[in-house]
Amino acid sequence: MKNEFRDLICENSEESNVFLCGIPLDKNASVGKGAKEAPRVLRELSYDLPPLDRKGNLLTKVKMYDAGDFVSEDFDILKSNMDEFLKYKGFHIVFGGDHSIGIATNRAFFDKCLRLNKIPVIIHIDAHPDICDTYHGSKYSHACPIARAIEYGYKDENITLCGIRGFEAQEIETFKKHRLLDVFKANDIKEMGIDMLISILRTKYSDDKYLVYISYDIDANDPSFAP
C-alpha cells in the first residue's frame, strides 16, 4: 500500500492514539449514490497530504491505527463492529458512508458512555437535522439518525445541531416536541461567527462528565465550496 496518511500510520494498535475505520455504505442515501466510495478515496487522497497542522508543525505525536472497513448493510452487525472498534483507547475517526451509519455508530458510543458513567453528547454538523421518524418509507434512512438516537436514549439537551439550513415538514413538528434540542442554523452561525459557536460548545460541554460524538456531513459546507 502507498504511504497512507504520510507516516502517521502505526501498525501496532497498542502504540497508537488515533483509531480509524470506514463504513462504506450508501444504501440508505436518497439522492445519488457514491458515498460508499469515500473511505477508499479519503485514504487515497491522504497520500498527498503532508503530516503538518495549519501552522506547519509536524504531527509527531499522532500515531494512527487503521482498523480497515466494516462492510455490512445490517445495523446490528455494524453496531457490534463499532462496539469492538470503540474498545481502542484513544481518539476515534469513522469514515462514511451516508449519514445512516450514525444509527449504528451513535448507539455504540451511547453504550460506551454508559459503561464509563459518562453523559453522551452528539454534535451534529449538517445542512439537515436528520431527525425524520421515517423518510421514503424507511426508519433507517440517512434522514433519520438523530431521531433514532433520541429513541435509543440520548437526551434532547445533549444534542446540538449545527449548520442547519434545510428541513422536512415532519422535522418542524418534531422540534415542537423536543424543545431542548440545541439548534444553530446556518444563518445563526454566519451572524455570530464560527469562533463564537466553538466557544459556546466548549463552555457547554467542558465538564469531564461528558463524552462528545461529532458527526459531520459535507453538505454543512457552503455549496460553493462543496457543490
Residues covered by each model-derived region:
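Conserved alpha-helical scaffold segments that buttress catalytic/binding sites
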Residues: 2-227
